[in-house]
Amino acid sequence: VVLTPGVLAKASNARGLGTEPERWFWFDPPFHRGQSVLLHKQCDDVWRIDFQLGRDADSELEKRPERVIPRIQAMLGPDLPFDLEWVSVYQFACRRIDKLRYGRVIFAGDSAHQVSPFGARGANTGVQDADNLAWKLKLVIDGVAGEALLDSYDAERAFAADDNLLNSTRATDFISPKSRVSLRYRNAVLQLASQEPFARPLINSGRLSTPTPYANSPLNTPDDAPFAGTMKPGTNCVDAPLRHQGRDTWLLDVLNALHGLAGGFTLLAFGPRPALESVADAGVSARVLHVGGDVEDAEGLLAQRYDGRSGTIYLIRPDQHVAARWRSFEAGKIRAALRRCIAVD
């Protein structure tokens, strides 16, 4: 990793990169043949340049200024003044541990799984681990739920880790092909993408991290009625613009204001307001958020994204994943779903 400040922005513009600083990725550029290069604009007039090195590179040798400076000059020109702020060599791996929970020891973030830096999956998945674990751990500590709820952390987040590992490995193989077939595919995609729009989405410089739906989670209650769209049990809630207390806001902000990760569940209700304001069972409760009463779906996007025809109810977990959904408000079914969602059944 090389951090270089100064007039690099002018050099970037001179090379036809435009005036707006943004990330750039080069595959097999003329100034670094056979490898890739990544450019980031950072604060305080600092630029970060990542040069891919060969698998047999000597890390101590490659950190020496006499090795680094010629690479930068080949990229930006021999006459551009710059300072080396920091130089380092790093390696990455795509792997995870067998289990994320061993008794009273729970692993999260980089201690549980490691991915390549492409796609911002490292820090994001660590935050998602914490979101998943926080409300479960609170309910167990409070004596509301048993340790079986912590087992669901392993089931859900190990599944998410595998999904991230798959996507990270695919990106790594595109950026740094390990076989002739992969190299031929990568080069063909790049050549096509310069002329054919259909090929551009195939360029994989790191698909950006998105939350993983827990499709097979033991905490999900299966649908008992048909629904359109993607908001199945286990899926992270899609955001939508709303009006709340006279102000423009968003669904996820309202959910955060209601409960955060304190252990509360939400019943998102479309159509007439349910007779009950909340439903409780086994030490947990779900509070009604009525669309049309508590919040206003002024643009209709919430109903569209959730297939929210009149009478529809969604049970939403504290980490903003869908636990269950129904076409009518039935307290008995909601109580059963709550028990299932805290692993007491």
Task: Give the residues covered by each predicted segment.
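Helical substrate-recognition/capping region of FAD-dependent monooxygenase/halogenase enzymes
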Residues: L139-D345
